[in-house]
Every structure is written in C-alpha cells, then in structure tokens.
Amino acid sequence: MDKPIEHYWQIRLKAVKEALEANHFEVFLAKDVGEANKIVKDQILPTLGAKSVSWGGSMTFLATGLYEEIKKMPGLEILDTFDRSKSPEENMEIRRRAVLADLFITGTNAVTEGGILVNLDMLGNRACSINFGPKHVVILVGRNKIVSELDDAMYRVKNYAAPANAMRLEKKTPCVKTSYCEDCKSPDRICNVWTITEKSFPKGRIRVILINQDLGL
C-alpha cells in the first residue's frame, strides 16, 4: 500500500468526522492545508454573507495562509487580533469586538474521538468565541489534535500544548523549564479558562475542518 500513514489517518479522520456530525457540527475533510484553505474560501465563506471576520490564536490558521488572504478580501471588516502595531489596550478592545464578529476562525487544543472540542485559554476570548458570540465559527484541526477521550484531551493540553506554547511565547512559567504543568501562580500563566464543547448549538454554527497533517501544538 502506498502512503499507509495517510491512509491510516483517513480512516481515523472519517470516524471523528462522523462523531462530530452526530454532535451537530458541520465537518469537512482536507488532505492538507492547501485544501483546507480552498474549503474556507470556496465552500464556506460564499455561503455566510459575513461582513466582519476575526480569529483566535492558532498556528494552524496561520499555516493555511488564510490570515494573509482574508485580510486582503474586499468588503470585509477585519478585526485583526494579531496586529502587533496596536497597543495592548487597543488589542484588548479588538478582542472584545471580535466576540460579535460574523465569522470567527481559530484552531482547537484537542478533539476527542467522540466528537468533543477541548480548549484552554489565557484570556478566554478564543474559548468564548467558539461557544458564543460570533454568528459562525470555523475551527481548523490537524490530525495530531485527536485523542481518545476527555481525560486524554485535558492531559494533552496541560502537559504538551500549554508548555510548548509557553515556550513559543517566551513566558516566564515553571513549565518552560520542566515541560509539564506545575499549576503555577505566575502572572505569565496562559492556562486560565477551560471550555469543553460537546455540541454545536445552533446546529451547524461551528464548522470543523479536519486536516490530514500534523499542525500546530
């Protein structure tokens, strides 16, 4: 068999797709970030009539190239939470406004085989927007985010994704030195707000694109 790893993941991704659909998410499968990019631009955006777009911190979103492309689209109000030219106060206000965007795009820290999304935030703006506020949400998910069940998801987030992100962001937290969660009290702590999304409500509000690549942390 050619490309057995890709075939293995095709089977697993299909099963997760079915589980998410049973939980009222709309789900797409993409072979790579290029196809995920096209799904958003050609299949999702034209159906939404969105006038404002924002996003939450996501390496997977950046990997698709959508960040740069969407910013150039005419007729869209862009609430750019990644704009480093803004002051901290201005960026916080953009994040507040993003909660009411027509479309919010982000990633997820983990997704279970049973079709549950698990996220842990520093500020809570991403976790909030996934679950309430924006009219539509698109979540881009690399295959490496799939775990068996909820306990595995929380372990993955606390002891892999969060320490790795703290290192990436050069935070002054104990996990940067130990590589696992110390349940710290540091002012730099990025683990403050958990959300567990068992269902999309209303049905189809959250669209998930499962990508057959390892992406993000």
Go through each PLM region and give its residues:
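Short N-terminal helix-initiation segments at or just after the protein's N-terminus
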Residues: M1, L79-S87, Y155, D183, ...
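Glycine- and acidic-residue-enriched helix-capping/strand-helix junction motifs
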Residues: M1-W9
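N-terminal active-site beta-alpha-beta segment that forms phosphate/nucleotide-binding
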Residues: W9-R95, L100-I105
